Regions:
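NTP-dependent nucleotidyl-transfer catalytic core
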Residues: 1-197, 201-205, 212-223
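Conserved nucleotide- and phosphate/pyrophosphate-binding catalytic cores
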Residues: 207-434
Length: 434
């Protein structure tokens, strides 16, 4: 399947420039495309993943991808999608952010072989440009009349409180120069980006055309390919939760939390996300959706999505661990979880510390202990929950006549330090014994 056709059936294609000439260009040989990444953070989120994935589809189609790190433009700040001036980052912070982001690309792209991906940093050429050089050789090709029509600029100009600085106003010129530089030095003819970057892409193509004045008419100048905004069906941003962003690296979002995020995607988005985010082929996805339609409660689409995404960024071993943890949590044996997974699974539940020396004494009885947690408010309420069989220790219900007299002991400790208490099906508390 051709590259653009692959993007179309997956719903990843928003706009292109170049028309039929672009298609001819792509099928007539191996080409080079780039996508830029803004180093505002030291890691990438799910929202940053789509362009990386598109670069991988580009690579699988027999073309070469370039990952452009914005070490130069990151010192300026992209005004696109921002209603206020960005806080300028230091050179040291930008360099640190780039180093952190680089961890993600090798999870998706192949950096070896005939179509090996390469990484470049636009600081290598932008920081070498003199101010007068930019004004004379680049700035003269940009019409301010056109630049102020760009949505990100227009919105800021209409905001009397914020406005837009000359620094951010110049971002479009620098991004266009990136495309020109890669066209000159690496024969890169395609820029891939989100739909909000369309205006910047067109500016870069126009700069290339002006630079190539006098070149043969049939020589391809450049083109852009954009993907749609990464949003859920309700319009919300993907990868944002009440507890924060979902990151692509284990130090920011654990494999279990990552897996759970995809498992909890609503039905109306799950099929679309399978196409957008995984590399499963069309027949496989259609078979999964058919299975889901026949038994929606089994959530086949979400399970396939969670497993596929977790395998990409955390490996097949963590997929298995996450599924085992889910089984243990919902009816299995919590004691079977290793210490790392136990910490991941219960990282977000309420927790408190207690004296290990009190285990086996009246102070560690459930009637005394439960009111000190967020599971109940009083000893009376604790007794009611115990009598009703609503309380579980490490996933095992405490029931029968002896429930009220139950006392936690060292035998209940998981990995020597933790006892998990649950009221009902979902209210958990992690007691740490020190």
């Amino acid at each position: 399947m051709q590259f653009l056709d692959e993007l179309k059936w997956r719903g990843l294609l928003h706009q292109t420039t170049g028309g039929d000439e672009l298609q001819k260009h792509l099928v007539s040989g191996s080409r080079i495309a780039y996508c830029g990444f803004d180093p505002t953070k030291d890691a990438l989120t799910i929202g940053n993943y789509m362009p990386i994935k598109i670069l991988r589809h580009w690579q699988l189609a027999g073309h070469k991808p370039i990952v452009l790190m914005g070490g130069g433009t990151g010192l300026i700040g992209d005004p696109s999608g921002k209603d206020a001036e960005r806080q300028l980052l230091s050179k040291e912070q930008v360099a640190k952010n780039i180093e952190g982001q680089l961890r993600c690309f090798s999870k998706v792209l192949d950096f070896e072989g005939e179509h090996a991906a390469i990484i470049v940093n636009n600081a290598d050429w932008l920081c070498e440009l003199g101010f007068l050089d930019v004004l004379r050789d680049v700035g003269k090709y940009f019409s301010v009349n056109t630049m102020i029509q760009k949505d990100s600029v227009k919105d800021r100009l209409n905001n009397r409180e914020q406005g837009i600085s000359y620094t951010e106003f110049s971002y479009m010129i620098l991004q266009a120069y990136d495309f020109l530089h890669l066209r000159r030095k690496m024969d890169c003819t395609i820029q891939i980006a989100g739909s909000y970057q369309y205006g910047n892409i067109v500016a870069g193509i126009d700069l290339i055309r002006r630079d190539m004045t006098g070149s043969p008419e049939d020589q391809f100048r450049g083109a852009g390919i954009t993907n749609p905004l990464v949003t859920a069906s309700d319009g919300s941003k993907i990868g944002k939760t009440e507890k924060g962003a979902i990151w692509l690296t284990e130090d920011r979002t654990s494999p279990y939390a990552f897996h759970q995020y995809w498992l909890n995607i609503p039905d109306e988005d799950a099929g679309k996300f399978l196409r957008w985010f995984t590399f499963l082929d069309q027949p496989t996805i259609e078979a999964i959706e058919k299975e889901h339609a026949e038994s929606p409660h089994q959530r086949a689409t979400q399970k396939a999505l969670a497993d596929a995404m977790t395998e990409i960024f955390h490996g097949s071993e963590n997929v298995e661990r996450c599924n085992d943890a889910a089984k243990a949590l919902f009816g299995g044996d919590i004691k079977s979880l290793d210490e790392t997974m136990l910490s991941e699974v219960f990282a977000e539940v309420p927790a408190g510390e207690f004296a290990k020396s009190s285990l086996g004494t009246e102070a560690a009885s459930l009637v005394e202990l439960l009111p000190q947690t967020e599971l109940c408010k009083s000893k009376r309420e604790a007794r009611e929950f115990l009598q009703n069989g609503s309380v579980a220790i490490n996933g095992k219900k405490v029931a029968g006549d002896t429930a009220i007299a139950c006392v936690l002991t060292s035998d209940d400790l998981l990995h020597g330090s933790t006892i998990l208490l649950r009221r009902g099906k979902k209210a958990w508390f992690a007691s740490r014994w020190v």
